[in-house]
């Protein structure tokens, strides 16, 4: 297997698909903005950062530390691979190391892949701290004995809104009283995912969580992060019914990105009808070229069936690629999913073909090439998916391949609609009566409702 540079892939694209390239956009590299360590940062944490090659913080990390330290609800908006995990890890652990009575922290992630990835990242950081708390992941894959251990002794727990709704809040008095009574921080990553009907339900789950925390004597600080949202301040205000400090001046450096917009050619059938070839006419040879030349690649498809079809087409007649080109989709067993994630991070897998299951901020290594088989549906998802590559500071390439649909055909011929358009706003309405009223019985089961309550005021449901 030869070693190929990302510049060679660009030459391959421009040579083999020259007549099909509708546009090329170049996002030039940007330098970062840095700040020194906070004066009150624990020396042990300073040593850990230095040991990991971190001599300074990005400006947004410094701001986040300052605001969280002042007990302010904080929203951090920055692009992928900008150190968001470190932004909340530092202030939380800085307080944890100095605290005489250990507190608990709840970390919420929208997908299992992201939860397991952050469990690994957070766990690695925690192992370097002498006064290390107990970390656990509470989701549908967690065995019964592990769940009991988490309930008894966890200081840091990773979970998701579904488990919060169905597993934690209904049992807050019997199983979670210890954890909730000392809950100090709630971290919500990828907060832009909580929008629409789903976000409205999640907002009411947070209403119930704050109510239960108040019953147990805790008043946690919310820390949120997002890479792509058009109305960050308004969104978190609607989601949590709290005022937030919004930090949106991203101080991380940006590597150079080349984005190609390709429209597969029109061909004539035997009946002389014109039709456009599918995205596979471009993605199959491109994936094969990348895999054979050691270019680490991710290809996004809209549906599971498309993932499987594309994978079969790539390895058809090229069975030597079967071990380094793999499909990733929903419906896999937990063991299969984690095995794929490990092999992807280690570099054993060179190309992963996936649905949007890997769209969010899971650290999947130093990828160089991103292929989008059709428009993902929103401008936010376009940038989220293309942001999977170039995370380690290296140049990267994104290839958008249009399908023969009205939306894709419009976008491939009007690329400024994507590259210059603002990110969509995330909207929700937690007071929608059809949603709000579904949470009233849940809240009443968790603790008797009273007319003077602020979270579930009687006026809202009369």
Region spans (language model):
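Conserved strand-helix element at the start of the C-terminal RecA-like helicase core
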Residues: 104-118, 287-315
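Conserved helix-turn-beta segment of the N-terminal RecA-like "Helicase ATP-binding" lobe
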Residues: 114-139, 238-244
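Conserved helicase ATPase core of P-loop NTP-dependent helicases/translocases
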Residues: 146, 332-355
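Post-DEXD/H (motif II) to motif III coupling segment of the RecA-like Helicase ATP-binding lobe
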Residues: 175, 185, 192-252
